[in-house]
Regions:
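Bacterial N-terminal signal peptides that target proteins for export
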Residues: 1-9
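Bacterial N-terminal signal peptides
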Residues: 8-18
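Small-residue-enriched, tightly packed secondary-structure blocks
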Residues: 25-193
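Sec/Tat signal peptide C-region and signal peptidase I cleavage site
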Residues: 19-25
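A detector of low-complexity, intrinsically disordered, Ser/Thr/Gly/Pro/Ala-rich segments
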Residues: 5, 13, 152-153
Length: 193
């Protein structure tokens, strides 16, 4: 029992250290013209997740306080499983205000103190996206529930000044902290690398 408690404490400390590093690296951005406002994001999330949730609104507010207004967002679903090493696969639609909508797929490996599986509906806020095609790359970060309120978890992933903030709500059980990345592609693939 003590070893389980020590493992959980270590996971929480590692996750907290990773979150602090991500927050320190990303200074709050000024509001971007043409970005999606909090009301638009909460409404889209309400329609997608099925219920209006105070937890969803709080997670979106936290993301906006850290990174400003996103110029795109993805609505989709994903599945993941892990036992030390893990995999995540998902698909959805990237919505932008002035560049149209785009079907995207994502996949990625993880490694860390992690075990379990989950299926999740996912909303990803996308910041500093210069064009829709710029989403097709790897976004690295520390995965796990960096910020967790009312059944919604938020993490942050970055690549080439673009920030992707997945907000997940799902079923299943996955406990731990891990390091990994998400790779976005224009077509579904089983290869997470």
């Amino acid at each position: 029992m003590r070893s389980v408690l020590r493992t959980i404490a270590a996971v929480l400390i590692l996750t907290g250290a990773g979150i602090a590093g991500l927050s320190a690296q990303q200074a709050p951005l000024p509001p971007q013209p043409g970005g999606f406002g909090p009301g638009e994001l909460v409404n889209a999330g309400h329609q997608f997740f099925g219920t209006i949730s105070r937890g969803l609104a709080q997670v979106i507010e936290k993301a906006i306080s850290l990174w400003g207004l996103p110029n795109g967002y993805v609505l989709g679903q994903e599945a993941s499983a892990a036992f030390v090493a893990g995999l995540r696969y998902g698909e959805g639609v990237l919505y932008t205000k002035n560049a149209g909508d785009l079907r995207v797929y994502w996949q990625g490996p993880t490694v860390g103190f992690d075990a379990g599986g989950e299926g999740a509906r996912t909303m990803m806020l996308v910041y500093n996206l210069p064009s829709t095609g710029a989403v097709y790359q790897r976004f690295a970060g520390i995965d796990g529930s960096a910020y967790f309120v009312g059944g919604f978890g938020m993490t942050a992933l970055t690549a080439n000044n673009i920030v992707v903030v997945p907000i997940r709500s799902g079923v299943g059980f996955r406990l731990g902290a891990n390091v990994g990345y998400l790779k976005f592609t224009p077509a579904a693939t089983w290869n997470p690398f």
